[in-house]
């Protein structure tokens, strides 16, 4: 595996509040990385820096070996970084194929090429092993897991190299959550880098190749999956939450 994104000593404050305090981590091509942390850990701020909504006060982002500065989400997207937020940014009363091509519709000179969009959507969903019976279905009729899948498919079609998934299993049933985690594995097989941001330790451990834990703006834990287990990660997160561990004892 080779480095896709490297985050080097990133700091970010909002007034007197230090959201990120020297965060360093990396995401490689063809791997799933889980970033775990409770509310207020700094996960959302880090996502917004990677996706171009915020600039770091200090530190660097290195994408495919080159330092990058994002002035907007479009800058991140142009390099192949796609972010899938909890709201998914889908239009409920439009069909699946239209949502996949939303704002980037295929046209035939003047008119929309519905046939082409439908064919490409079906081919894409099949390639990602996403099983939806009819691409003409409106998004409002899909389950939560299927909606996640449509949002991911849209990102992949437009040449994503890295997918950020923000709490992708929140409010999903156990069965639907497993389907979303399997989708992340399929993205890994296609050579993409996947960063899953979650507070669910079990799901994060299950799907990830490597696990980071963020607490009050600092990375307090980083190990490969085979080097740790759910119990250790839970102990670390609980100990820091209760103030039983000094930051100098980072694992």
Curated annotation (Swiss-Prot):
SUPFAM superfamilies: P-loop containing nucleoside triphosphate hydrolases. Transmembrane segments: none annotated. Disruption phenotype: Deletion of the gene results in a growth defect on D-xylose and L-arabinose. It is found in: Cell membrane. Gene3D superfamilies: P-loop containing nucleotide triphosphate hydrolases. It is an enzyme of class 7 (translocase). GO terms for molecular function: ABC-type D-xylose transporter activity; ABC-type L-arabinose transporter activity; ATP binding; ATP hydrolysis activity. Induction: Up-regulated in the presence of D-xylose, L-arabinose and D-arabinose. It comes from the Archaea. GO terms for cellular component: plasma membrane. It catalyses: D-xylose(out) + ATP + H2O = D-xylose(in) + ADP + phosphate + H(+); L-arabinose(out) + ATP + H2O = L-arabinose(in) + ADP + phosphate + H(+). It is a peripheral membrane protein. Pfam families: ABC_tran. Keywords: ATP-binding, Cell membrane, Membrane, Nucleotide-binding, Sugar transport, Translocase, Transport. Its EC number is 7.5.2.13. ATP binds at residues 37-44. Residues 5-241 form the ABC transporter domain. PANTHER family: CARBOHYDRATE TRANSPORT ATP-BINDING PROTEIN MG119-RELATED (PTHR43790), SUGAR ABC TRANSPORTER ATP-BINDING PROTEIN (PTHR43790:SF8). The complex is composed of two ATP-binding proteins (XylG), two transmembrane proteins (XylH) and a solute-binding protein (XylF). Belongs to the ABC transporter superfamily. Part of the ABC transporter complex XylFGH involved in the uptake of xylose and arabinose. Responsible for energy coupling to the transport system. This is Xylose/arabinose import ATP-binding protein XylG. It comes from Sulfolobus acidocaldarius (strain ATCC 33909 / DSM 639 / JCM 8929 / NBRC 15157 / NCIMB 11770).
